[in-house]
Amino acid sequence: MIEGLKTRKYDIAFCSKMGNEPSIEFIPVAKQDLVLIVPNQHPLSTRNEIDLADTLPYPHVGFSKRSGIRPTIDKLFLECGGMPQMAYEVEEDQAVAGLVAAGFGIAVVPHMPILAYMPVQIIRIARPTWERIFYMCTLKDVYQAPVINEFKGYVRQKAKILLKT
């Protein structure tokens, strides 16, 4: 997404915040918690909440290094004292959830509506605590058409409401 902004393929992108991007304006617009998902018959499936350290013995399905959320999840695991064994790495949230549903491992993912329709158990992460912020991203210091600026203003207004809850 960020690369698409830089090449002017996109006027606006919605994604996680990336470090070391001085030419990009990141405006927070929504938040989302991270959860652990496990297959329905997994030994952890009866848990309501979990310390991420308790997940380290199990194979994980993770996000690839190209994913914006990967550094955040890695940081959470380092806070817990270790990194999980990655059975598979993919880029998209839904692909991670699909591999977990098929029994290929467990995963830390954003809490998203599709999880309710998949054969996985959703477990709240008690430690470490964290929430994901989504950003509206645009290039700084470039001309933007009036319609783009109007859309940015609309999103900012809606974001104020979303971020209060």
Spans of model-derived segments:
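Secondary-structure junction motif
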Residues: P59-C80, Q144-K152, A159-L163
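Short beta-strand-centered segments that line the small-molecule binding cleft or hinge
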Residues: M1-V38, V96, V100-F104, V120-I125
